[in-house]
Amino acid sequence: MLTIYAPSDRPQSKCWEVFNGIQKTWPDTPVQIKDNDKSYYRENSDTMFWGLVNNNTNIIRDVEYFGFNYWFTDTPYFGRFDNNNLKADNHYWRICKNNIHASYIPSLDNARLNSFDITVKDKKDKGDYILICPSSAGIHRFIGQTGWLTDTITKIKKFTDRPIVVREKPRGRGTSGPSEAKIPLVEQLKNAWCCVTSCSISAVESLCEGVPVICHPKSFAQPICDTQLNAVNNPKYVEPTDWLRSLSYQQFTPEEFADGTAVSILKDLRLL
């Protein structure tokens, strides 16, 4: 049994771009939908979630406590939707097993990454300030660090006198993300020495711009980035292409969820 926790009273939610396909293609098991404003009832089955909306944080914690598998779906690492240009096969959603972010699977091919117009620049060797990109309040609650931003600024100041610039997650018009940014992230990265984030997807653009990243240990960037703030004066930089390949294989279009492509790839990766 796969139990999907979803807002059944919100048919307009973008979660159904994933869950409608999952209900058609998930292998060898019946699928049931439960409202995600309810509590989790222990059952020996996989569960699936869309973001950290409603009661998902508490339900995921219960699932982890009981040791069952779960799947987490949310915004992608690249190929994000644009409400003004929604078309078939032009936007993606990530799917992650037993975590809210994708794991690092090394040595995959370029087949999926080549679908995106991604350029990786050489590492920058200079910068004027530390750019801090906090995740959402919901993510900080999930990782148990509601005071992450204040704590991070305080700690950074112990190790460097470089100026600090904070870039809050862009929000507006009932949504969030790059489309709502008054200043594009790439502009703020031009003069950044490094990017410090908890679990923000800004890590992708930062590394592609050649800007080192320091992230939280639970970030998807952790496999190739420093996680300790005392590295702020000399943060490591690992060429990210292999890591980007891994991310590209853990996000899919609505059409790929519906036609079985997502399930087939997850099986090939031995995640499913």
Question: Model-predicted segments: where are they?
Answer:
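Leloir-type glycosyltransferase catalytic cores
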Residues: 84-127, 223-272
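N-terminal pre-catalytic "stem/leader" segment of glycosyltransferase-like enzymes
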Residues: 1-50, 138-139, 265-272
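Extended catalytic core of nucleotide-activated donor transferases of GT-like folds
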Residues: 32-85
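Donor nucleotide-activated moiety binding/catalytic core segment of transferases
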Residues: 33-41, 55, 165-213, 218-219
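Catalytic donor nucleotide-activated moiety binding site of glycosyltransferases and closely related
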Residues: 6-9, 133-134, 138, 147-185
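Short, solvent-exposed loop/turn segments at secondary-structure junctions
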Residues: 9-11, 53-55, 76-79, 135-139, ...
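Well-ordered, non-membrane alpha-helical segments in soluble/globular domains
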Residues: 15-23, 56-57, 145-159
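Structural motif
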Residues: 45-48, 129, 193-194
